[in-house]
């Protein structure tokens, strides 16, 4: 297929147009005074959302070159969302500012590679500054504040804080839709492993791309299963008592996987195959954890057991198993309570005796998975669009709260980024053009506060100047502007806080993608094919 090419300034301008379209749509949602965006759906009611990444993902532009710029900015939001689940709008605002300021410098003759190098040095200084001023999250009130800000709803904040306190920071919390209009919460014992289904054909819920099996039998082995003959005896025995079977193995492929998928599609058996978590000796230990939790037996040739010798008594049980592409959760394993407690005590003893920090960390993860619980938050609303919007906010708030517990908090409302600017004075540059990269980030770090003020109907420049003046007068770096009340004050005391991980990820991802965009010199895209018009019908033909 023939290609069309753009070079130099023309290429960068096309990318900028795409970046601006996405950023202008996304940044209107920033902050508690941010607006909603309504997204048309081919079927059903439109989706109304306050979530930056949801807006960004929906944008597809007709011009292929502009669309490249748009997709790069979508990547900023998506990457930030994947890592921390929040801060996507902040990352988008930062990236747009870096791109716009950077393109001015490049057009004026600065070297884009040196600008990028300056940006990379500057972002390291900002991240170090953010970490140095982080305040650890110690109590439930702090978690409630963080979650409430993310969701713009104090009820959601209190709910998430309560659930996190109940299951512990190592527990698993999932968000589901409720049939009622109020929030509901359920607590269940369970274990989550970081391996999902081997094939998407095992999915039972296409909307959520999840495989859900109720009351399944569970085969646990450390062997790779390629031949169906290996598991045929246990399959036949299992089919006499249930259709639901979960297989946890080193791998399932070839004929065995094909047979399971075909029989699943035919409805003969509702199977789910999951790869075993971990590697080496740790994998065997984790498989043994699953076996004890579910009351099954680990089938391993190391202990003289082959797959074809497995019986129904060797299979574990659980009330429910849920698997997506990344994780699998075993809910209410039917294992013996005394055996589970003994296993927990055994792991605790290993934690106390180990001298390796890495081993201690992995043992603590296993302990959390065995001892931790699973909480289900059910979100209710009066209408379908409101339900989806509220569910998005709860998911974001949950991710934000977890991030706060991990790395601590900083003052919110763009204050942390504003007060990190002096750290850029200490950045050592080798070449003159690297200074431009530092200058670009200096300006970009003001942009989130500027946009927050703009969304609240205020002049961003005036707000930033006032905040700086008050910080200097009162010698308090936590002073900022509360866009909800229109007051200036200590953001920590007002409960306006952001997790360090969210703020840090937003800056790092914005600089990463914007740097790539600034150093782009050529764009290549397919020339769209013109579809021939339909032929006109011949004379005398009756239609």
UniProtKB/Swiss-Prot annotation:
For the protein in the UniProt heading, the enzyme class is isomerase
**Entry binding sites for ATP:** 29-32, 86-90, 413, 482-484, 498
Chief subcellular location equals cytoplasm
For the keyword Isomerase, the answer is yes
User: What InterPro entries has UniProt attached to this entry?
Assistant: Cpn60/GroEL, Cpn60/GroEL/TCP-1, GroEL-like_apical_dom_sf, GROEL-like_equatorial_sf, TCP-1-like_intermed_sf
| Disulfide bridges in this chain | none
Q: What are the GO cellular component annotations?
A: cytoplasm
Cellular localisation: Cytoplasm
The reaction(s) annotated as catalysed by this protein in its Swiss-Prot or TrEMBL entry are: ATP + H2O + a folded polypeptide = ADP + phosphate + an unfolded polypeptide
Record carries keyword ATP-binding: yes
Keyword terms, alphabetized: ATP-binding, Chaperone, Cytoplasm, Isomerase, Nucleotide-binding
Q: What is its EC number?
A: 5.6.1.7
What terms describe the molecular function in GO for this protein?
Answer: ATP binding; ATP-dependent protein folding chaperone; isomerase activity; unfolded protein binding
Note the coiled coil stretches, chain numbering: none
Biological process (GO) annotations held by this record are:
protein refolding
Q: How does it assemble?
A: Forms a cylinder of 14 subunits composed of two heptameric rings stacked back-to-back. Interacts with the co-chaperonin GroES.
Matches recorded under NCBIfam families: GroEL, PRK00013.1, PRK12849.1, PRK12850.1, PRK12851.1
Similarity-based family: Belongs to the chaperonin (HSP60) family.
What's the stated role of this polypeptide? Together with its co-chaperonin GroES, plays an essential role in assisting protein folding. The GroEL-GroES system forms a nano-cage that allows encapsulation of the non-native substrate proteins and provides a physical environment optimized to promote and accelerate protein folding.
Full protein name: Chaperonin GroEL 1
Q: What organism does this protein naturally occur in?
A: Roseiflexus castenholzii (strain DSM 13941 / HLO8)
């Amino acid at each position: 297929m023939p290609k069309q090419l753009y070079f130099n300034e023309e290429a960068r301008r096309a990318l900028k147009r795409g970046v601006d379209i996405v950023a202008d749509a996304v940044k209107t949602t920033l902050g508690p005074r941010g607006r909603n965006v309504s997204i048309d759906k081919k079927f059903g009611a439109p989706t109304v959302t306050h979530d930056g990444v949801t807006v960004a993902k929906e944008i597809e532009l007709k011009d292929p070159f502009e669309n490249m710029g748009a997709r790069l900015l979508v990547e900023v939001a998506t990457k930030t969302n994947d890592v921390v689940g929040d801060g996507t709008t902040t990352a988008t605002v930062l990236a747009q500012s870096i791109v716009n300021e950077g393109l001015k410098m490049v057009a004026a003759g600065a070297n884009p590679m040196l600008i990028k190098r300056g940006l990379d040095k500057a972002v390291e200084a900002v991240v170090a500054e953010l970490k140095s001023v982080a305040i650890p999250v110690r109590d439930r009130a702090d978690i409630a504040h963080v979650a409430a800000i993310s969701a713009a709803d104090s009820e959601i904040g209190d709910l998430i804080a309560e659930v996190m306190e109940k299951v512990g920071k190592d527990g698993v919390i999932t968000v589901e839709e409720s049939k009622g209009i109020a929030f509901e919460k359920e607590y269940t014992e369970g274990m989550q492993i970081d391996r999902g289904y081997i094939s998407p054909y095992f999915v039972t819920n296409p909307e959520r791309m999840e495989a859900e099996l109720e009351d399944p039998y569970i085969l646990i082995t450390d062997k790779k299963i390629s031949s169906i003959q290996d598991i045929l005896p246990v399959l036949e025995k299992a089919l006499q008592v249930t259709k639901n079977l979960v297989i946890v193995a080193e791998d399932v492929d070839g004929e065995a996987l094909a047979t399971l998928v075909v029989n699943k599609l035919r409805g003969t058996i509702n199977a789910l195959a999951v790869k075993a978590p971990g590697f080496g000796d740790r994998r065997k230990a984790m498989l043994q954890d699953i076996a004890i939790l579910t009351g099954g037996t680990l089938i391993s040739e190391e202990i003289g057991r082959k797959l074809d010798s497995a019986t129904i008594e060797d299979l574990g049980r659980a009330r429910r198993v849920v698997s997506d592409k990344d994780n699998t959760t075993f809910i209410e394993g039917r294992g013996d309570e005394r055996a589970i407690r003994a296993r927990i005590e055994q792991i605790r003893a290993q934690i106390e005796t180990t001298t390796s920090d890495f081993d201690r960390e992995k043992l603590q993860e296993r302990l959390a998975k065995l001892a931790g619980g699973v909480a289900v938050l059910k979100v209710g609303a009066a209408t379908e669009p409101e339900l989806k919007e509220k569910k998005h906010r709860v998911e974001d708030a949950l991710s934000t709260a977890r991030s706060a517990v991990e790395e601590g908090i900083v003052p919110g409302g763009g204050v942390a980024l504003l007060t990190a600017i002096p750290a850029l004075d200490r950045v050592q540059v080798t070449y003159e053009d690297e200074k431009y990269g530092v200058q670009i980030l200096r300006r970009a770090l003001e942009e989130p506060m500027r946009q927050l003020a703009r969304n609240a109907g205020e002049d961003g420049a005036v707000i930033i100047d006032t905040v700086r003046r008050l910080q200097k007068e009162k010698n308090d770096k936590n002073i900022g502007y509360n866009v909800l009340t229109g007051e200036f004050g200590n953001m920590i005391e007002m409960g306006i806080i952001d997790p360090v991980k969210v703020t840090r990820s937003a800056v790092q991802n914005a600089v990463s993608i914007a740097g790539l965009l600034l150093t782009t010199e050529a764009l290549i895209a397919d020339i769209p094919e013109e579809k021939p018009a339909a032929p006109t019908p011949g004379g005398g033909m009756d239609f």
